[in-house]
């Protein structure tokens, strides 16, 4: 087994016996086999696009299948094998179409001709291919590092692209880049600089993918507005929806309307409460339950209703709650109930609804608690004059963007302590599940502006970027000259894609933690430090002093 795509990878240098996420070596090997076959499909799709043959079905499939190989998404070899079979079927049908259409049939590479041996061990085949992937990168560890950076970043781009197309937002250039980059991973002739350029291109395309998803959310549900979200449950039957997929959350709300079931969000779906059309159209979307993904074994065990996982992060479930747990889309785990999509792409959620009706639900009220969400770009930039005046008069000294992924490592308490120690004349922007380290802190206000503003999900890094660019334009300076410090936490591959976007934009002095990626070699890290001043977090006191100096 070889996997080092997440922050919690074993001993900080890769998982070789069993995944720290709970992924078995067998699942890891089949994921590697799937990725290899997706690269072969991408080769054929690029040829089809050159010849004006429709590829949208394959484009979306590649994104979903890459999504399935992300951390804490799919632990089920049966499900992954179905993705693998679909991949080969789509590839062969498209090859046949090309051969029948073109006067001169294409000459296919080994990559696009690879045929898994269904009678033999898929695990062994996957292990062989990943070893070949490494060996074909020669002995240059820096090139291997950058190849892995590109691959992991592509997974993040694919996940955002998949969600955006659910909401009707697509850009063929995004699909084409994903496929072209997948094929380039087979190249052995690219220089170190060319791999650096490709990694930064991943960041550029991810910016576009996040823009598409932002458009899908805001055009469908309206721009987020400041909204108070209850953290205390109310009496009645309940369904908990976890993950990131707001389109599927809406589908669940539609299918539970008039059924006297209260719907709660979990994890990265907290920002959904800020979208006005969701709140207006579905009054049974009530509150938020639980905190970040790594606490789900405790949160899910206590929740007295059905639970639906729409995306990452799924942990191996305990038997105390696995019977009330349902998965959809790319998410799968052996023995959990999977709800397949219908022709519309929306599952029939009846099994989860029936389970919720059979369960006790919440039987008593608790003391009211709440948090605020909805401070996306429209909200913040609508008061830009007030913000600018606050900075000019010295009432606002500095902005901190403290966000990213949460995780189980003890070192992540750094982020809680840092936010608690941020001076009272500074504002904290946050996004993604890293916020759960401090999302309920009462930090007060500066001149009517909340000192803690939740910008949204991890993909709302796009919104945070627009806020930073808007402030920079207002002050007539570059982003690196405004009083803003980025202190980020990472865990999985979406965070890698977002980091590459920030580097593509030339943003300097990012502090990253709790540890640096295992797949980044010392030479690549030195390049990032020399050119972008990227640095690991130290202590809250030291980093605050450096940022405010």
UniProtKB/Swiss-Prot annotation:
Localization per record: Cytoplasm
Matching InterPro entries: HCP/CODH, Hydroxylam_reduct, Prismane-like_a/b-sand, Prismane-like_sf, Prismane_a-bundle
Residues the entry annotates as binding hybrid [4Fe-2O-2S] cluster: 244, 268, 313, 405, 433, 458, 492, 494
EC number(s) stated in the UniProt entry for this protein: 1.7.99.1
List of residues that carry Cysteine persulfide: 405
Membrane spanning stretches: none
Gene3D superfamilies: 1.20.1270.20, 3.40.50.2030
Broad class of where this protein is predominantly found: cytoplasm
Sample GO molecular function, one term: metal ion binding
Protein role: Catalyzes the reduction of hydroxylamine to form NH(3) and H(2)O.
Family: Belongs to the HCP family.
Protein name: Hydroxylamine reductase
Gene source species: Gloeothece citriformis (strain PCC 7424) (Cyanothece sp. (strain PCC 7424))
Upper taxonomic lineage: Bacteria, Bacillati, Cyanobacteriota, Cyanophyceae, Oscillatoriophycideae
